[in-house]
Amino acid sequence: MKVVELPGFQRGFAKLPKHLQEKTWYQLHTFLEHVGSPVKPKSLRLKKLPFGNFEVSINMDLRILFQLHGDALILVLLGDHEDVRRYLRR
């Protein structure tokens, strides 16, 4: 699967401390291992959101907002719950 990072994700990722960057890649790797599987690990806290968006939790405060288009995983945003809500309101 091809992974595409949009600027909103890149900005959020650059602001994170090293340990959260590592946790972010770990969660993405875990998600990619289970794409197409009917069972996803509960630790991902995967949610389907409006407009073809999905959300995966990094920790209790941090979320990845993404979209799936064919064989591409589009990483849209990395931020807290309020950042995700603001993005979805647009």
What do the PLM-derived regions correspond to, one by one?
Residues 2-4, 11-15, 21, 56-90:
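Enriched for short, Lys/Arg-rich terminal
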Residues 4, 8, 14, 39, ...:
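Basic nucleic-acid-binding interfaces
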Residues 30-56:
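A short, surface-exposed loop/turn module that caps and links secondary-structure elements
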